[in-house]
Amino acid sequence: MRLDRSGINPTPLMLGNDVLGDCTSAGIGNHIRATAALAGFQVAMDVADAVRFYSRSTGYVPGRPATDNGGVEVDVLTTALRDGYALETQTLFPIWGSADPTDLNGIRNITAGLSAAYLGVQLAQADMWEDQDGNLPPVWDTDSPADHGDPTPGSAGGHCLLLWDYTGTADTDLVTLLTWGAKQKATWRWVRSRIMEAHGLAWGQLHAPGGLYPTGDDWAALVAANDAYLAGAA
């Protein structure tokens, strides 16, 4: 089983994640863009949009580095559900739910049905190795060369990224991740070793009719579940 989206460009953006720990906000922004790309259009956004939401969802204060501490994914997603992800001309509201991060089949279903899976991973120092041109390893894998640094998950901290497609389901089959404004290849065994949380997002304002996207009673049930979650979190 594979999910081939090589003919569709989700055009991920950096959205400030090269200078700030706003990967949770950038992940939501790029999820919007991935969803739009699958529907045949695109949604414009910029660094200011991502930083504004990062501030709203985490308490980051621009110009005060001590407040740049990243975000907790469920808290950030709850902020998006409650307040929306504000862009210059519109505010987009997701509904969302969490999945068992050890259930890779479930994550594949999220990726296929909801445009991309929103993941939290523990990066290793070996994942952050760069060649002489400043490029990351072409494929993230668990058998990185010894000179690439510590391969221990978490030795480079946590990160939020999106899973976009995959060539198969075997351990060494490749997935495409959307992170830092680019497509990054990894193996499924890398995903298994690094993943710590997984979430699905759906955008009622963006999706095109048809396909695997929830509609009708399924959509109503998701909305009701999110409303109940917000009521409990209030």
PLM features: what roles do these ranges have?
Residues 1-234:
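Catalytic-core signature of thiol
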